[in-house]
Amino acid sequence: MKIIHKGLVEYLPTFEAMKTFNAGRNADTEDELWVVEHPPVFTQGLAGKPEHLLIRDDIPVVQIDRGGQITYHGPGQLVVYTMIDFKRRKTSVRNIVSALENSIIATLAEYGIEAAADPKRPGIYVGERKIASLGLRIKNGSVYHGLALNVNMDLSPFTQINPCGYAGMEMTQIADFVQPCPAPDEVASKLTAHLETQLTPKADNNE
């Protein structure tokens, strides 16, 4: 699996690049993880309802093809796009989602943060506060989009939306629990290591 660090990049060109990558895949295309941050942007998923955008300002809203409702991306949030051929890996989308969840939880545990998935709501939570979001698109036996982990960012734009369609959802981030807060690059190193482990087919782990 190839890990590509793209730095701070605009959302829309990245979204187009994901679609292009997935459309051009063949049986030999190596899976990739794209590690990025984005300038401020709201992204509205396929199930998105306009009423979940509570306040319109100068932050752009981009309609995209992942599942789910509206969320926010901004600097200081670690985003990992998972370009994975799950058919070739002989796994399921549910297992991919579990791998993403487990990787986030394990990464946060390294910083002494106890987090968990919620079977009733997508994402990862510390208590009742959401610290990470997940959203995928399934096409041609592969997935793209991925996860977003709040590290050290301005959380106030989340008050302009119902995050992932949940009114009053409180958000949190690593900086609320760890000072000095680790840089996103450090968190990315830990998270991608866990992702590689979690996404490796179990048969390969036994070799």
Swiss-Prot record:
EC nos: 2.3.1.181
Additional free-text comment from the UniProt record: In the reaction, the free carboxyl group of octanoic acid is attached via an amide linkage to the epsilon-amino group of a specific lysine residue of lipoyl domains of lipoate-dependent enzymes.
Taxonomy of the source species: Bacteria, Pseudomonadati, Pseudomonadota, Betaproteobacteria, Neisseriales
Known pathway: Protein modification; protein lipoylation via endogenous pathway; protein N(6)-(lipoyl)lysine from octanoyl-[acyl-carrier-protein]: step 1/2
Protein name according to UniProt: Octanoyltransferase
Record's function text: Catalyzes the transfer of endogenously produced octanoic acid from octanoyl-acyl-carrier-protein onto the lipoyl domains of lipoate-dependent enzymes. Lipoyl-ACP can also act as a substrate although octanoyl-ACP is likely to be the physiological substrate.
Active site: C164 (acyl-thioester intermediate)
Site keyed Lowers pKa of active site Cys: positions: K130
Keyword Cell cycle found: no
Reaction(s) this enzyme catalyzes, per UniProt: octanoyl-[ACP] + L-lysyl-[protein] = N(6)-octanoyl-L-lysyl-[protein] + holo-[ACP] + H(+)
PANTHER family: LIPOYLTRANSFERASE 2, MITOCHONDRIAL-RELATED, OCTANOYLTRANSFERASE
Gene Ontology CC annotations of this record: cytoplasm
Annotated binding of substrate, by residue: R66, G67, G68, Q69, I70, T71, Y72, H73, S133, L134, G135, G146, L147, A148
Protein's cellular compartments: Cytoplasm
GO biological process entries: protein modification process
SUPFAM superfamilies recorded: Class II aaRS and biotin synthetases
Ranges of residues in domain BPL/LPL catalytic: 27-203
InterPro entries named in the record: aa-tRNA-synth_II/BPL/LPL (IPR045864), BPL_LPL_catalytic (IPR004143), Octanoyltransferase (IPR000544), Octanoyltransferase_CS (IPR020605)
Keywords: Acyltransferase, Cytoplasm, Transferase
Presence of the UniProt keyword Acyltransferase in the record: yes
Example GO molecular function: lipoyl(octanoyl) transferase activity
Similarity comment text for this entry: Belongs to the LipB family.
Entries under NCBIfam families matching the protein: lipB, PRK14342.1
